[in-house]
Amino acid sequence: MARMVQCIKLNKEAEGLDFPPLPGELGKKIWQSVSKEAWAGWLKHQTMLINENRLNMADARARQYLLKQTEKYFFGEGADEAAGYVPPQA
């Protein structure tokens, strides 16, 4: 049976992650309160931030930036939007 969590991002009960996605306290916090669906949404947003901002993941500053954005995305006021990104029309 799947582990269920009250997802902080989607505001509903949903299937939780199988393991903490990051090391440390942030990973534990995400594992306890973020669903697989919300995590998949973050991975898409993270990819967009990396590509649009041309982040070099070998650079420690880029990795720290993404960790801060991860925390803001789930537990803060929301992550940065990629500069120049225009969402598709519905």
Curated annotation (Swiss-Prot):
Keywords tagged on the record: Iron
Keyword Iron on entry: yes
Cited InterPro entries: Fe_traffick_prot_YggX (IPR007457), Fe_traffick_prot_YggX_sf (IPR036766)
One GO cellular component, as annotated: cytosol
Domain of life: Bacteria
One GO MF term attached to the UniProt entry: iron ion binding
PANTHER family given in the database record: FE(2+)-TRAFFICKING PROTEIN-RELATED
Family: Belongs to the Fe(2+)-trafficking protein family.
NCBIfam families membership: PRK05408.1
Function comment: Could be a mediator in iron transactions between iron acquisition and iron-requiring processes, such as synthesis and/or repair of Fe-S clusters in biosynthetic enzymes.
The protein's name in its UniProt record: Probable Fe(2+)-trafficking protein
Species this chain originates from: Cupriavidus pinatubonensis (strain JMP 134 / LMG 1197)
Lineage of origin: Bacteria, Pseudomonadati, Pseudomonadota, Betaproteobacteria, Burkholderiales
